[in-house]
C-alpha cells in the first residue's frame, strides 16, 4: 500500500493506493519515483481518465477506485476523509492506441504512428509510443508498410477482431481458473428470464468475458466483436426489463370463475364433517348457560329507556 498526494488540491489531499510490490522495489532502486500519473482518453468512452505509467519498467496501469460511504483513513497523524481506495492494475497499452488507430482508420490510408497518436486534449498520449515491443503489438490490429526505412500503419478490422477474440478466450480461461460463477451475472446483464438463460455454460463464460473486454473498446467495435464471436442476441421483447406497472383499461373486468358456488352453507357443512380435536371436544361439553356471546362485547350498546 502506498500513499500519494493530489497536486490539484491546495490542502495536499492524500490518496491511498494499492500497488504491485515490484513497482515500489523499482522506485527504491532508482532512489527516485518513476511513477507518473497521466490523463488519457478512455478507450471505451473517449473521455479523460487517470492512468499510471512506470517510466522505469515501461508499464501501463489503469486506476480503479473503490468508494464506501462514511469511510476515512488514518494516515500518520492525520485523518483523510472520503476513504477512497485506489487500485493500480496492469493494462495492455494497445487498447489505448486502438482509440487513435480507429480514428485514423476512417481515412483509409497508411500513416506514420507519430501522426496517428496525436491529441491536443490529452497530449501525454505520446508516452504510449515509448513502450517496448510496440511494433510487435501493432501487428495485431494494423496493416504495415515500410517506405524508405519508415513504417506506416493502417487500421485493420479483421486483425483487430481476431486479436480481441484471443483476449476473450484468455479471459474465459482466467474466469474458470478462479471459479467465477458467471451464469447469474449474464442473466442479469442481458435481462434473460429464468427459462431463457443459455444452458451452454461455455457460452455464458464467453458472453461475460465479452462484456469485460467491451469496457476497453468503443460500443460499435463491441457489437462487431459480439457478431464475430457468434453470440446470440437477446430477444427483442427482453431488450429492456419488463415493466411492473399494471395495464389500465376502461373495459369491465369479468371473473373467470363463479365464486358464488362457495357459499356459507357449503362452509358450514365442511366444518361439520371435519374432525374435532380433544380440546375442542372438551370445550363443547362445558356448560355455557349464563355466558355472553362474544358478539355482545363488540356489538352496538342498546340505549336504556326509563321514566324521568
From Swiss-Prot:
Q: Which residues are connected by disulfide bridges in this protein?
A: none
Gene Ontology annotations of biological process type: fibroblast proliferation; gene expression; in utero embryonic development; mismatch repair; negative regulation of gene expression; positive regulation of fibroblast proliferation; regulation of DNA damage checkpoint; regulation of G2/M transition of mitotic cell cycle
* Cellular component GO terms held in the UniProt record: nucleoplasm; ribonuclease H2 complex
Keyword Nucleotide-binding appears in the UniProt entry? no
| Sites of N-acetylalanine modification | 2
Concerning InterPro entries, the annotation shows: RNase_H2_suB (IPR040456), RNase_H2_suB_wHTH (IPR019024), Rnh202_N (IPR041195)
Q: Which residues carry this modification: N6-acetyllysine?
A: 292
Where is the protein localized? Nucleus
Main subcellular location: nucleus
Q: Where are the transmembrane segments?
A: none
Please name one Pfam family that this protein belongs to. Answer: Ydr279_N
Could you tell me the keywords of this UniProt record?
A: Acetylation, Nucleus, Phosphoprotein
Q: Which residues carry this modification: Phosphoserine?
A: 293
- What protein family is recorded? Belongs to the RNase H2 subunit B family.
Q: What does this protein do?
A: Non catalytic subunit of RNase H2, an endonuclease that specifically degrades the RNA of RNA:DNA hybrids. Participates in DNA replication, possibly by mediating the removal of lagging-strand Okazaki fragment RNA primers during DNA replication. Mediates the excision of single ribonucleotides from DNA:RNA duplexes.
State how it assembles: The RNase H2 complex is a heterotrimer composed of the catalytic subunit RNASEH2A and the non-catalytic subunits RNASEH2B and RNASEH2C.
Question: What is the protein's name according to its record?
Answer: Ribonuclease H2 subunit B
UniProt organism field: Mus musculus
Amino acid at each position: 500500500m502506498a500513499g500519494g498526494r493530489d497536486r490539484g488540491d491546495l490542502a495536499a489531499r492524500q490518496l491511498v493506493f494499492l500497488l504491485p510490490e515490484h513497482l515500489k522495489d523499482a522506485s527504491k532502486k532508482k532512489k527516485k519515483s518513476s511513477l507518473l500519473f497521466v490523463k488519457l482518453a478512455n478507450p471505451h468512452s473517449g473521455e479523460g481518465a487517470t492512468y499510471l505509467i512506470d517510466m522505469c519498467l515501461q508499464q501501463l496501469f489503469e486506476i480503479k477506485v473503490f468508494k464506501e460511504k462514511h469511510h476515512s483513513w488514518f494516515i500518520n497523524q492525520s485523518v483523510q476523509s472520503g476513504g477512497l481506495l485506489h487500485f493500480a492494475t496492469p493494462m495492455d497499452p494497445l487498447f489505448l492506441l486502438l482509440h487513435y488507430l480507429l480514428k485514423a482508420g476512417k481515412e483509409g490510408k497508411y500513416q506514420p504512428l507519430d501522426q496517428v497518436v496525436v491529441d491536443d486534449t490529452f497530449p501525454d498520449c505520446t508516452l504510449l509510443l515509448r513502450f517496448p515491443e510496440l511494433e510487435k503489438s501493432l501487428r495485431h490490429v494494423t496493416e504495415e508498410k515500410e517506405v524508405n526505412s519508415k513504417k506506416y500503419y493502417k487500421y485493420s478490422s479483421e486483425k483487430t477482431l481476431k486479436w480481441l477474440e484471443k483476449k476473450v478466450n484468455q479471459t474465459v480461461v482466467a474466469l474458470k481458473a478462479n471459479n467465477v460463477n458467471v451464469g447469474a451475472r449474464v442473466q442479469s446483464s442481458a435481462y434473460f428470464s429464468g427459462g431463457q438463460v443459455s444452458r451452454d455454460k461455455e457460452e455464458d463464460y464467453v458472453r461475460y468475458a465479452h462484456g469485460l473486454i467491451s469496457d476497453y473498446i468503443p460500443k460499435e467495435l463491441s457489437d462487431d466483436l459480439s457478431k464475430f464471436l457468434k453470440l446470440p442476441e437477446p430477444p427483442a421483447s427482453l431488450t429492456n426489463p419488463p415493466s411492473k406497472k399494471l395495464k389500465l383499461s376502461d373495459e369491465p373486468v369479468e371473473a373467470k370463475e363463479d365464486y358464488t358456488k362457495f357459499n356459507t352453507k357449503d362452509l358450514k357443512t365442511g366444518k361439520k364433517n371435519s374432525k374435532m380435536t380433544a380440546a375442542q371436544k372438551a370445550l363443547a361439553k362445558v356448560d355455557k348457560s349464563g355466558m355472553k356471546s362474544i358478539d355482545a362485547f363488540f356489538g352496538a350498546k342498546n340505549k336504556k329507556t326509563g321514566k324521568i
